[in-house]
């Protein structure tokens, strides 16, 4: 029965597109394995340098995403962020994201460290979670950003988590679009 429900959800969700605004497209897609991919895509009217810097510099992160950030931009580097303006980098609310690789102004692959602040069910799957982000410079001063959240399992807990991430990410990405 679980397998049938999982198959039905996979088929159903592979065709659903979520969008807070037309400016951000959020899609849950299935892969050949029992995993789901969260694809989020949007366009920003800004120079490629500015959008790349928004993702890869302290000033960039603190301009649109978080009040506190530290960045060590290199393969094997780390992005440390904190959504708590009263907190500090290194406290229990710091989010640590590893930079797996990058191609300047084209692509960055990230992997978040799963801490005690994440749901328990994610901890055993921590090695599977990646975010691959592509940056494409378009005509007329726009940049297309396409993010692939990889490693989500196709079950009820992860579907609920993905719905949370869709809403939270779209709100955050709207801040980047306005930045």
Describe each model-derived feature in a short phrase.
Residues 18-70:
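Hydrophobic ligand-binding cavity/cleft-lining segments
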Residues 59-94, 102:
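Short beta-edge strand/loop motif at the mouth of beta-sheet-based domains
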Residues 48, 83-85, 101-103, 112-114, ...:
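A mature extracytoplasmic/lumenal domain signature
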Residues 1-24:
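Bacterial Sec-dependent N-terminal signal peptides
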Residues 45-49, 73, 100-108, 134-144, ...:
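A short, structured loop/turn motif at beta-sheet edges
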Residues 51-52, 61, 79-81, 99, ...:
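Hydrophobic pocket/interface hotspot
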Residues 40-42, 68, 94-101, 128-137:
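Hydrophobic/aromatic beta-strand elements that line small-molecule binding cavities or substrate pockets
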Residues 119-166:
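Beta-strand/loop substructures that line and gate deep hydrophobic ligand-binding cavities in soluble
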């Amino acid at each position: 029965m679980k397998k049938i429900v999982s198959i039905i959800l996979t088929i159903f969700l592979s065709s659903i597109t979520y969008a807070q605004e037309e400016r951000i497209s959020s899609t849950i897609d299935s892969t050949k394995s029992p995993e789901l991919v969260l694809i989020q895509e949007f366009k920003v009217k800004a120079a490629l340098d500015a959008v790349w810097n928004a993702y890869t510099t302290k000033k960039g992160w603190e301009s649109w995403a978080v009040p506190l950030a530290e960045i060590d931009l290199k393969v094997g580097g780390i992005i440390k962020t904190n959504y708590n303006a009263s907190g500090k980098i290194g406290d229990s609310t710091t989010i640590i994201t590893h930079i797996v690789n990058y191609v300047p102004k084209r692509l960055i692959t990230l992997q978040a460290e799963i801490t005690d602040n994440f749901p328990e069910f994610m901890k055993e799957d921590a090695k599977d979670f990646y975010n691959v982000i592509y940056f494409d410079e378009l005509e007329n001063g726009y940049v297309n950003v396409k993010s692939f959240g990889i490693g989500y399992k196709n079950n009820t807990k992860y579907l609920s988590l993905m719905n949370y991430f869709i809403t939270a990410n779209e709100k955050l990405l709207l801040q980047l679009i306005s930045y």
